Amino acid sequence: MSQVFKVAVLPGDGIGPEVMAEALRVLDAIEKKYDVKFERTHANVGGAGIDLEGKALPETTITICKTSDAILFGSVGGPKWETLPPDEQPERGALLPLRKIFGLYANLRPAIIFPSLTGASSLKEEVIAGGFNVLVIRELTGGIYFAQPKGIEGEGRDRVGFDTMRYSVPEIERITHVAFQAARKRGKKVCSIDKANVLSSSVLWREVVTGIAKEYPDVELSHMYVDNAAMQLVRWPKQFDVILCENMFGDILSDEAAMLTGSLGMLPSASLAEGTFGMYEPSGGSAPDIAGQGIANPIAQILSMGMMLRFSFGMVDAADAIDNAVAKVLDQGCRTRDIFQEKPGEKLVNTKEMGDAIIVAL
């Protein structure tokens, strides 16, 4: 009897439904190839949730997610909902509560340049010749974004705004284990990012990470101040394998690393809880300017689905097959508009045609 996994499918807004459709077609192909069954339940989120059910994260959606093994998330947001109070807008009203409800503490964002796409990067080709593959692991639930006290006090020009940057030993330990376990399956290097020369929380961060590293003698650990890391990512990204960051530093560096690749439409992400539950989504936004035109790049959504197979369902072979199929299609010259450079051998394709090519390559 086939193994059965339950997936909550949240397409969201903008290009979300279009790219999600291609990811689900690839999932159909995986079902046939690996004799497995994915029970999919669609639910509203973001602007779609607001329009159809009155809030960005409806209770029905939460219930569906709670009865699923993983969440496959599209994208949320758009100009239509920007006039709502900030906490009710699609991004803050959906993503932050999902992270809190499901304890999603570890964000994994690969920044990959495939060898056939080095010309799309903003970096000089000699810096990234042969491509690169960096994994940024960001702690999601602690640090300056969440620690108390925070706020604005006083009146007029006497007002003061303040935030607290706080980390506990257990918070640092669990994200560090995620980084080292990931590095063991890759290039066996972890670079931990901090600002230990000025921040007390970073002093503790470095101390705890150094201690945990002793449990992984096969993995090389280095430390780097965040300002230097921002520079080194641009100077020589291939020096990195796994980059371990607290929340704010990871927020900034993961976006920087992503843009080095040339297109956010290529980059997946995973947000993991304790155990095997996770939420998987593209790193890019909802791109309302191209929604409905059938030209969006579905690769990030497809690779996010591949990360779901790898991290939540333990289907490493299937995840590798998806990664290899995407690489093969790119080597064959298939390009959506965002990565099309008009080079010899390139073929401009739409959203569905890119999905078709990846399914054939599988």
UniProtKB/Swiss-Prot annotation:
Cofactor(s) of this protein: Mg(2+); Mn(2+)
Pfam families assigned to the protein according to its UniProt record, in alphabetical order: Iso_dh
Top enzyme class: oxidoreductase
Top-level taxon of the source organism: Bacteria
Location (main, coarse): cytoplasm
Pathway(s) it belongs to: Amino-acid biosynthesis; L-leucine biosynthesis; L-leucine from 3-methyl-2-oxobutanoate: step 3/4
Subcellular location as annotated: Cytoplasm
Note on how the cofactor is bound: Binds 1 Mg(2+) or Mn(2+) ion per subunit.
Annotated site (Important for catalysis): Y145, K195
Annotated Mg(2+) binding sites: D227, D251, D255
Positions with a binding annotation for NAD(+): 78-91, 285-297
NCBIfam families named among the record's database cross-references: leuB
Biological role stated in the UniProt entry: Catalyzes the oxidation of 3-carboxy-2-hydroxy-4-methylpentanoate (3-isopropylmalate) to 3-carboxy-4-methyl-2-oxopentanoate. The product decarboxylates to 4-methyl-2 oxopentanoate.
Protein name as annotated: 3-isopropylmalate dehydrogenase
